[in-house]
Amino acid sequence: MRGVETRIQEIRHAVFTEVAKMAYEEGPVDKKIEALPYKIIPGETGNFRNDVFLERAIVGERLRMARGLPYRGAAEPAPVSDGIMEADKPEGYYTPPLINVIKFACNACDEKKVHVTDGCQGCLAHPCMEVCPKKAISLDRVTGKSIIDQDACIKCGRCATVCSYNAIIVQERPCAKACGMKAITSDENGKATIDYDKCVSCGMCLVNCPFGAISDKSQ
């Protein structure tokens, strides 16, 4: 997120710092890069996702991309250092594309969803129900609070607009919302995927992903 220093920036800085150090240190780069996920994510327990192995795998892909290497999915059995010796040349250039989704880091956020929060007061007017063009809102007969039928909802957001208590929210996938080219959709697993025919590599998805699942490459 722009203007806010988060743990995502902390990891990003650590990755690029360690990659930069490699240029000034002696020794084989393949062995160095294999050890770096353990240096950046030390210990026995995870710091961010409660799974230290997943965290190290994500950092491993970030390290590869920081060296300009291609992203690999979780199903590809290869060490972090795969291809690094060929890429470790002064005239080397990153392997396109520049912006990549690390699929196993993606939270598979809903593309768009309308929620009734605990702020609903169960008011008498129920303007949310009145303005819904698909009659997707009903009432809980015990509490009087609104319930949205997600199968019928078309995510127009009219209910959120008229709620006097701002108790209805429209959630959108942050990376897709930030993309001015509408280049981000979902794959068969609900993970974010980039249409590179539309993508202009602006990086807005990268800075807006709360899970740090989108990374860029360096040369």
Question: Which residues does each PLM region occupy?
Answer:
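Ferredoxin-type iron-sulfur electron-transfer modules and their immediate structural context
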Residues: 1-162, 166-178, 182-190
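Flanking helices and flexible, charged tails adjoining ferredoxin-like Fe-S electron-transfer domains
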Residues: 167-219
